[in-house]
Amino acid sequence: NAPSEALKRACIPAVFVEITVDNSGCSKQRGAVFGFQGSDPYSSMRHICGDTNKFLCGIGQGLHAAIITGDKDVESGLVFSIDDLIFPKNKAHLGFGLGNIGGLIFTVPAHEKKTWKFVVCFYRGGNVTAGTGSTYFYTQYFSSVEDVAAYGLLHFDYYRERAVLSDKMVLSSELSQERIFSLCHSIRSYCGSTEFLLIDNKPCWIVNEGEYRMINTLDLTVDHLFFEMKMNPW
């Protein structure tokens, strides 16, 4: 019964990334690259450009994954080798639609420190399960990976604040740094093994048993009980 906007904001299929490059102690400009190598042989890497009121620059693979930024001083490049992104022989070649490696390139002037915001977006439309057919819940609110990016960039500060608030839950504890890292990694791995689906127009929250892609068995209930009571009391 939650409001539509609240559900949309909660189920966005995206990861929010801030990258800060501190070049304040250097007399030369410094460049950085953020990207990935496509692994789907049936979906080509591509440049993503759109309405400047939403986003300015991005790279993606097919229709299901992308990295997009709203910062103006970023260029996209598609290449066959990461070296060609960092040390391009001809910058014009970066704009070609060839190559299985895509990256966003940004530069910090000498004696400056800058931060960029990126939204790593995902999208799978249509039926996504066999046996019992289902769609991802977020497809009710987003129509494409570009749509996800536009919304994510518009509300980036909100998601950043939520992430900082979430970090305080563990950073304020008396756990060692090693245990804090392990706990944060475990929570993210747990969330990464979940699926929020729509089956017969009804929401269905599934927790898979990690890499096995099975629904959790009863013996794991004890392991999850304390986590669920804290994080998902419903």
Where do the PLM segments sit?
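Carboxylate/His-rich catalytic cores and anion/metal-binding grooves
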Residues: 220-234
